[in-house]
Amino acid sequence: MTIADNKKAFFDYFIEERYEAGIVLEGWEVKAIRAGRVQIKEGYVVVRDAEMFLIGAHISPLQSASTHVNPDPVRTRKLLLKADEIKKLIGKVEQRGYTLVPLNLHYTRGRVKCEIGLAKGKKQFDKRETEKQRDWQREKARIMKGDAKD
């Protein structure tokens, strides 16, 4: 079940590979995510010391969050992947033009997971071409639907 999608990632990048990673969360964060108070649009993934971290994801704390915990909505969260996956991704990210972006948050067997994508940035003309393709598909569907009624 999807919790939050990053539609901006699909508009700004060509997604070449996808990986599922666990996230190290605090208790108040899990409660807030279950309540749907999460946004990953501004998030990105970095590699530090052979570990991966999700930066810029915003999890708004609930009003009922404990007073003895100081919630930080945009703290850096560690991503959990297998060592061989991390090594493979480090090699790819070091190549020119590749980056890691969070694509969505979802549940797998009751646990919150983050799908990350190995992505290459789109140029402005690529974005325009994608938009034209989407408009043409929509127009084609409209024409076919009109033909079916006649």
Curated annotation (Swiss-Prot):
<comment type="function">
    <text>Required for rescue of stalled ribosomes mediated by trans-translation. Binds to transfer-messenger RNA (tmRNA), required for stable association of tmRNA with ribosomes. tmRNA and SmpB together mimic tRNA shape, replacing the anticodon stem-loop with SmpB. tmRNA is encoded by the ssrA gene; the 2 termini fold to resemble tRNA(Ala) and it encodes a 'tag peptide', a short internal open reading frame. During trans-translation Ala-aminoacylated tmRNA acts like a tRNA, entering the A-site of stalled ribosomes, displacing the stalled mRNA.</text>
</comment>
<keyword id="KW-0963">Cytoplasm</keyword>
<dbReference type="InterPro" id="IPR023620">
    <property type="entry name" value="SmpB"/>
</dbReference>
<keyword id="KW-0694">RNA-binding</keyword>
<comment type="similarity">
    <text>Belongs to the SmpB family.</text>
</comment>
<dbReference type="GO" id="GO:0070929">
    <property type="term" value="P:trans-translation"/>
</dbReference>
<dbReference type="GO" id="GO:0005829">
    <property type="term" value="C:cytosol"/>
</dbReference>
<dbReference type="InterPro" id="IPR020081">
    <property type="entry name" value="SsrA-bd_prot_CS"/>
</dbReference>
<feature type="region of interest" description="Disordered">
    <location>
        <begin position="127"/>
        <end position="150"/>
    </location>
</feature>
<dbReference type="GO" id="GO:0003723">
    <property type="term" value="F:RNA binding"/>
</dbReference>
<dbReference type="Pfam" id="PF01668">
    <property type="entry name" value="SmpB"/>
</dbReference>
<dbReference type="InterPro" id="IPR000037">
    <property type="entry name" value="SsrA-bd_prot"/>
</dbReference>
<protein>
    <recommendedName>
        <fullName>SsrA-binding protein</fullName>
    </recommendedName>
</protein>
